[in-house]
């Protein structure tokens, strides 16, 4: 198998509140990925807050091992020499970033020590700019295999207002809030705003998936689509419960990640880096805490984690 292209599509604060997990949050692009790839019903983040979780899925390490124990813009740092771009770069990959990662202080562009070969210009993590920017990149993708990280700010507060011509506002009467929050007019309106925001996020993913098809890259591209942690609501994000740690995770591509499979065994976002290395033929660094999920998907093992 030739080295596949690898794309991480990650959203802020979405939890599992997307269509394939049985929630009435229309996300047809993520649903399409689930029907064509593999849906992980018990995927969890390594931390219930942004920077620690993101550092974990970019290094394959737990937060206490990569050093990111708090938010990057509040002074916390990770060991960027452990960032997956270095591992894949050594294996011959071109690496690109579009949108946000939130592992460095907020500023325009990526900090040089992040190690990306190319930063795709966009308006931060706004879906309206990330979708077209990534699509344009894919049309002229490099000849060598590439790793692309595309991060969206959508489903992070403050929820932007609905766009009636594109994403109509949701009727709050039919938008029950997530557990364990009370069902009130205020929480219903909040959930309606979240759902409108999720539509914007999903539309961005749809643009990128369509661009992969149009450029002829889809067949040899591993697409990993997921959220960093739970919803940015009380008793959800920042809590070490399923409400804070449970995330959607869908993977499509070569290596057995196809056919609309559903996996119920527990997996973690720290497993994404070793999985990428496994398919890329790259050495999995000794510091990685996660394990490749390819053997699980292909039925070679029954489980990956005991704790």
Which ranges hold each PLM region?
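Formylglycine-dependent sulfatase
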Residues: 1-307
């Amino acid at each position: 198998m030739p080295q596949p292209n690898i794309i991480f599509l990650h959203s802020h604060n979405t939890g599992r509140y997307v269509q394939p997990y049985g929630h009435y949050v229309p996300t047809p692009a993520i649903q399409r990925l689930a029907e064509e790839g593999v849906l992980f019903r018990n995927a969890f983040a390594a931390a219930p807050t942004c920077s620690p979780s993101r550092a974990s899925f970019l290094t394959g390490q737990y937060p206490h091992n990569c050093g990111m124990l708090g938010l990057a813009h509040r002074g916390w740092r990770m060991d960027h020499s452990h960032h997956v771009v270095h591992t894949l770069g050594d294996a011959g990959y071109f690496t690109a970033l579009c949108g946000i990662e939130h592992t460095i202080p907020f500023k325009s562009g990526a900090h040089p020590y992040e190690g990306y070969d190319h930063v795709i210009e966009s308006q931060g993590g706004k879906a309206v700019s990330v979708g077209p920017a990534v699509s344009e990149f894919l049309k002229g993708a490099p000849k060598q295999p590439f790793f692309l990280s595309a991060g969206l700010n959508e489903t992070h507060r403050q929820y932007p207002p609905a766009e009636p011509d594109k994403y109509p506002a949701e009727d709050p009467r039919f938008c029950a809030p997530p557990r364990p929050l009370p069902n009130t007019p205020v929480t219903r309106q909040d959930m309606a705003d979240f759902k409108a925001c999720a539509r914007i996020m999903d539309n961005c993913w749809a643009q990128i998936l369509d661009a992969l098809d149009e450029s002829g890259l889809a067949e040899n591209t591993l697409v990993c689509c997921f959220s960093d942690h739970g919803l940015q609501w009380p008793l959800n994000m920042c809590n070490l419960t399923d409400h804070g740690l449970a995330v959607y995770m869908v993977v499509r591509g070569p290596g057995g990640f196809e056919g609309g499979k559903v996996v119920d065994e527990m997996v973690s976002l720290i497993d994404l880096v070793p999985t990428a290395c496994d398919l890329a033929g790259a050495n999995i660094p000794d510091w990685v805490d996660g394990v490749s999920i390819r053997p699980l998907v292909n039925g070679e093992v029954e489980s990956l984690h005991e704790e």
